[in-house]
């Protein structure tokens, strides 16, 4: 899903585009539920601020960007990162403090980024 012109209302009638947005929102929600479970198991160091209920915000803003655009989110940035297309496994590895994470496990949940 490449960025779109927000003035182009025809995308709101494009079923494939809307389906992709919905699938990304479901991905964000599922990711957040799993991250919360891992946090509850004591596998996540530090704290975590989830974006459950805010899936459309991250996915919708990400949909308006191109792959070359940068985005800086708040401490509830999982949805924005996933909406922009950051790899799910790399993000989860980051949250778990693994070297294979987007920031080699040093950023954690609140400092997710992928350059």
Named regions from a protein language model:
Residues 1-45, 67:
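Cofactor-/ligand-binding subdomain signature composed of acidic, glycine-rich
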Residues 33-37, 43-115:
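Cofactor-binding active-site loop characterized by glycine-rich and histidine/acidic residues
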């Amino acid at each position: 899903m490449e960025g779109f012109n927000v003035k182009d209302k025809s995308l709101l009638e494009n079923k494939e585009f809307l389906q992709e947005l919905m699938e990304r929102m479901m991905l964000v929600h599922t990711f957040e539920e799993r991250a919360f479970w891992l946090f509850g198991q004591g596998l996540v160091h530090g704290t975590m601020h989830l974006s459950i209920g805010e899936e459309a915000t991250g996915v919708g803003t990400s949909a308006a960007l191109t792959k070359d655009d940068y985005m800086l989110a708040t401490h509830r940035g999982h949805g924005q990162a996933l909406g922009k297309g950051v790899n799910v496994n790399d993000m989860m590895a980051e949250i778990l403090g693994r070297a294979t994470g987007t920031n080699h496990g040093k950023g954690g949940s609140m400092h997710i980024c992928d350059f």
